[in-house]
Amino acid sequence: LPTSANQEDHVSMATYGARRLADMVNNAAVVVGVEAMAAAQGMEFDRSLKSSPLIEAQFAAIRQRVAFLEQDRYLAPDIDAMREWALQADWPAPLRACQPSHA
């Protein structure tokens, strides 16, 4: 990023970039959390159907954090709980293998 007409540009943008990356990670976690919450809500509509043990385990983890949505309610606490769920570090190995970074 030029700051002085391309002369003596010694300004590192790493700190700013890292702060932006932290915001992007949080925003992505909100999106993933909301998508998972919607998927869990959809699964509840017909619980006679079962999924894989891996999906069922994550479904149970989601339901520990967020109850079934029976009627309108303020969703900010649920969204925050799901953001924390999405940021967890202990994902099962098959899910970690699907991540681009294999984190």
Predicted regions and their residues:
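C-terminal auxiliary extensions adjacent to catalytic cores
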Residues: L1-A103
